[in-house]
Amino acid sequence: MKRTKKYPFLTLQRQRFHLNFENASSAAGIPAERDFYRWAWSALKNEYRRADISLILLDEEEARAYNRDYRGKDYATNVLSFALNEGEILPCQVSEKLYGDLIICPQVVLKEAAEQGKTPERHFAHLTIHGVLHLMGYDHIEDDEAEIMEAEEIRLMLAAGFPNPYQEDEY
């Protein structure tokens, strides 16, 4: 395996984690693929040794179609998560391999970041982590589940060098 000097941590982790990244969005100001990789891996690394995730950036029209078809909501949302084992309750074990798809709509993310006074990078990081946590079985429908998921999001964002994602700030 060829090693990269610029991002050596990616070479080591690629043996365990594969991110199939596709940018099918026309939006400007999207972080680099390596950033999405780093954010996704930060959420996975303590609970999964192996993972295969597709992360696709789609424009609003396509994101809206997925949200309508799979959630019955006729609008573009920031992130959608599709776990291979969705609907099954599986304990997170280090030996499992996680499979799933994430769809992120950059136009929605950029709009929300501006409205919430967050940098785009911070909001993309948060929603990538948020989506991966959904793939891992976290949810926020019930209040007690939301507390657990939000606490994990805050922990991971702080570890990645970002502030609490649930606090607004000016940039």
From Swiss-Prot:
GO cellular component, one term: cytoplasm
Top-rank taxon: Bacteria
EC number: 3.1.-.-
Swiss-Prot/TrEMBL cofactor(s): Zn(2+)
Broad EC category: hydrolase
Cellular localisation: Cytoplasm
PROSITE patterns: UPF0054
Co-factor remark: Binds 1 zinc ion.
Classification via Gene3D superfamilies: Metalloproteases ('zincins'), catalytic domain (3.40.390.30)
Assigned protein family: Belongs to the endoribonuclease YbeY family.
Protein name: Endoribonuclease YbeY
Species per Swiss-Prot/TrEMBL record: Neisseria meningitidis serogroup C / serotype 2a (strain ATCC 700532 / DSM 15464 / FAM18)
Recorded name of the encoding gene: ybeY
